[in-house]
UniProtKB/Swiss-Prot annotation:
Residues 4-186 form the tr-type G domain. InterPro entries: EF-4, EFG_III/V, EFG_V-like, EFTu-like_2, G_TR_CS, LepA_C_sf, LepA_CTD, LepA_IV. Its EC number is 3.6.5.n1. It comes from the Bacteria. This is Elongation factor 4. One of its GO terms (molecular function) is translation elongation factor activity. The keyword Cell inner membrane applies. It is an enzyme of class 3 (hydrolase). One of its GO terms (biological process) is positive regulation of translation. It is a peripheral membrane protein. It comes from Geobacter sp. (strain M21). The gene is lepA. GO terms for cellular component: plasma membrane. Belongs to the TRAFAC class translation factor GTPase superfamily. Classic translation factor GTPase family. LepA subfamily.
Length: 599
């Protein structure tokens, strides 16, 4: 294959702007998928991806296309995830390309995630051209959207392709533009092997399959390869391309995109962004830009039925095979029993994993409120990182606590700006800028503490804006904050599963809210129950569940007052004794409802 005839490209789009449908049309037009195999969203392999209309893992497919100039080209489509939690994966997938199609819905215009990914593409020096999709819709306004793209992103749109992936309009024009506008890859097959690993997944028969873009050199069956980040070596068992099913080839040359199977046992060994080279003839330096992905959001997962603990453990291990950015450790809670503390890249990642556990493995789970990673500076000069309230040391041992801040850009129609500003202020945000992108769309940029965002920010954002807002965020830094641990106590006993780390100013309101909610949920007992919210030793809110009372005087008709008093005293004694020995069982529904309040 002549390197001048290869084009590597990806499609950049916001969720629901028609990326997967467009990919389907390209597959059909080039005859890669016959109409018999055709199904919607061919590249989205997981049911969950199809259903939620999002791409979670990167996929690649090779298209053979004879252009109008009579030459045969190989087009490698690298399908990238479009969601904010997977930014690092996107940046690596984009590095494997030379160009990109920016797909924008002609009726909706530019959204926050689109922007984030376009900037990633431009940073990677990709040649980006614009495709306006869904032009068949009555609401489509191509001229307005073109002006918006030029204004916001600064891309030239005078020759943007007008298309409708659903109707198949403009598919040929897009393919011609790819051939004309996107440069061929640069690379030298004679140099030592240097390849970028941009995705990997686990296959139960063949071990880990890695997707690579060969930068220099050649790789073939039987070669001994080495991963540069951990220096592990493997022998290549198969190498090939997806067209769109796996097809083994003689070799993969510079400029090509394909897969390698090399008997790698764990996905954790095949890290996205790593450089693959040959053991006996290594390249001199690894590719730039590799970094370890660290979980940002943590949550406890507990099976509702404790007998499902083993199942949950096996299910988590299986998911971990395919997703090295996800982490889990066993933990126990007095209230919820045995479970796991899981780490995720962000909120969407957390939702996806939870949903996959429930759907693919039939587990019923309780999840505790999500938390972030805090840095605790001790009075003795030590620094520890914690993920849950139960790990926070006593107040007297803490010098100060730092929490992560993010830079959030929110795109929203101008009617809702007031509500968004109020929400960000309530969440302790610091305003950076407000920019009118068009007379009707506004970009609001705020610095926000991540722990305020993980609870219910996204849901509130959507409900304030009737679903029209889009959010993108990046991690900024850690900042010192006045954070305290809020404990919920029942009859003086702390319920560990309900403890949370919260800002001092909000502790009272959250405590008030939680105890009043619990008062409704805890069933009455024969003795009274005190529910308290406390910060340190100071109780800041209290509710009491009154005792049920048996009428012990019912059988005394008339009679002496001392007789009645004796019975009442006896009842009082009994209740006192009961209160000392009786413990309150919290019903499961109470937990679920309380965890909802925490949002």
């Amino acid at each position: 294959m002549v390197i001048e005839h290869i084009r590597n490209f990806s499609i950049i789009a916001h969720i629901d702007h028609g990326k997967s449908t467009l990919a389907d049309r390209l597959l059909e037009f080039t005859g890669t998928v016959s109409s018999r195999e055709k199904q919607d969203q061919f590249l989205d392999k997981m049911d969950l991806e199809r259903e939620r209309g999002i791409t979670i893992k990167a996929q690649t497919v090779r298209l053979n296309y004879r252009a109008d100039d009579g030459k045969d080209y190989v087009l490698n489509l690298i399908d990238t995830p479009g969601h904010v939690d997977f930014t690092y994966e996107v940046s690596r997938s984009l590095t494997a390309c030379e160009g990109g199609l920016l797909v924008v819905d002609a009726s909706q215009g530019v959204e926050a995630q689109t922007l984030a990914n376009v900037y990633l593409a431009l940073d990677a020096n990709l040649e980006v051209f614009v495709v306006l999709n869904k032009i068949d819709l009555p609401a489509a306004e191509p001229e307005r959207v073109k002006a918006e793209i030029e204004e916001i992103i600064g891309l030239d749109t005078h020759d943007a392709v007008l298309a409708s992936a659903k109707e198949g309009i403009g598919t040929k024009d897009i393919l011609e533009e790819i051939v004309k506008k996107i440069p061929p890859p640069q690379g030298d097959p004679a140099k030592p092997l240097k390849a970028l690993l941009f995705d990997s997944w686990y296959d139960q028969y063949q071990g880990v399959i890695i997707l690579v873009r060969i930068v220099d050199g050649v790789v073939k069956k039987g070669d001994k390869i080495q991963l540069m980040s951990n220096k592990k070596t493997h022998e290549v068992l198969k190498a090939g391309v997806f067209s769109p099913e796996m097809r083994e080839t003689q070799q993969l040359c510079a400029g090509e995109v394909g897969f390698i199977i090399a008997g790698i046992r764990e996905v954790a060994d095949a890290k996205v962004g790593d450089t693959v080279t040959l053991l006996h003839n290594p390249c001199d330096a690894a590719l730039a830009g590799y970094k370890e992905v660290k979980p940002m959001v943590f949550s406890g997962l507990y099976p509702i039925d404790t007998s499902q603990y083993e199942q949950l453990r096996d299910a988590l291990a299986k998911l971990k095979l395919n997703d090295s950015s996800f982490s889990y450790d066993p933990e126990t809670s007095l209230a919820l029993g045995f479970g796991f503390r899981c780490g995720f890249l962000g909120l969407l990642h957390m939702e996806i994993i939870q949903e996959r556990l429930e759907r693919e493995f039939n587990l019923e789970l309780i999840t505790t409120a999500p938390t972030v990673v805090y840095r605790v500076h001790g009075t003795d000069g030590s620094l520890t990182t914690i993920q849950s309230a139960n790990q926070l040391p006593p107040t007297q041992e803490i010098a100060y606590v730092e929490e992560p801040f993010i830079l959030a850009s929110i795109h929203v129609p101008n009617d809702f700006v007031g509500g968004i500003l109020a929400l960000c202020e309530e969440k302790r945000g610091v305003q950076r800028e407000i920019k009118y992108l068009t007379p009707t769309r506004v970009m609001v940029v705020y610095e926000l503490p991540l722990n305020e965002v993980v609870l219910d920010f996204y849901d509130r954002l959507k409900s304030i804006t009737k679903g029209y807002a889009s959010l993108d965020y990046e991690l900024l830094d850690y900042r010192q904050s006045e954070l305290v641990r809020l404990n919920i106590m029942i009859n003086g006993e702390v319920v560990d599963a309900l403890s949370l780390i919260i800002h001092k100013d909000k502790a009272y309101y959250r405590g008030r809210e939680l105890v009043s909610k619990m008062k409704e949920l805890i069933p009455r007992q024969m003795f009274e129950i005190a529910i308290q919210a406390a910060v340190g030793t100071k109780v800041i809110a209290r509710e009491t569940v009154k005792a049920m009372r048996k009428d012990v005087l019912a059988k005394c008709y008339g009679g002496d007052i001392t007789r009645k008093r004796k019975l009442l005293e006896k009842q009082k004694e009994g209740k006192k004794r009961m209160k000392n020995v009786g413990n309150v069982e919290l019903p499961q529904e109470a937990f679920l409802a309380i965890l909802k309040v925490e949002g």
